């Protein structure tokens, strides 16, 4: 059914123009940058966790991908591991994001925190199955079942269909460990650029970029960017 809503007034269509916040929680100076962007990220993540904002998920980030047709897409996913090798999240390998990462193995991550933002760009690779299995075993059983149910996702499903598949999978794996689905696992984003943004009063924000000076990403240089 098609409905024409072009002339329908939206409650907040004008309100958003006047929504703004004066950032006064701090500043980011060059002398405050750590040599390693990974350690800098770790420090900011720790600070965000310690704020204990109700409802916040400090490990949530926006993952941006692009199809082979150059059509971008973005969604929020959860960071589940990171080290100097990269940043790992888990998903269905049949999902749109996985399809686009297979076709175009590059991605961008954005963490939006309290008056701070971290943007990371990198190439991607699949996590090996042993690492995926280790993480999968740590998940709640309901989430493990949910991963199997997601095998049946399509462009359109009904709630009843999903509920029936959930019961089917619960019965299938009753009284046994739920195995890792062959279509489910991790992706690792291997950074080649980091940006750290700190909001400041008057919109003269602090923004610094890290770029590697060698192919091993052992050494990085920083530069200040325009707000």
From Swiss-Prot:
Alphabetized UniProt keyword annotations: Flavoprotein, FMN, Oxidoreductase, Phosphoprotein, Pyridoxal phosphate, Pyridoxine biosynthesis
Keyword presence, Cell wall biogenesis/degradation: no
Binding note for cofactor: Binds 1 FMN per subunit.
Keyword presence, Ligase: no
Reaction catalysis annotation: pyridoxamine 5'-phosphate + O2 + H2O = pyridoxal 5'-phosphate + H2O2 + NH4(+); pyridoxine 5'-phosphate + O2 = pyridoxal 5'-phosphate + H2O2
One Gene Ontology biological process: pyridoxine biosynthetic process
Cofactor needs: FMN
Pathway per the UniProt entry: Cofactor metabolism; pyridoxal 5'-phosphate salvage; pyridoxal 5'-phosphate from pyridoxamine 5'-phosphate: step 1/1; Cofactor metabolism; pyridoxal 5'-phosphate salvage; pyridoxal 5'-phosphate from pyridoxine 5'-phosphate: step 1/1
EC number: 1.4.3.5
Listed Pfam families: PNP_phzG_C (PF10590), PNPOx_N (PF01243)
Record-given protein name: Pyridoxine-5'-phosphate oxidase
Gene: pnpo
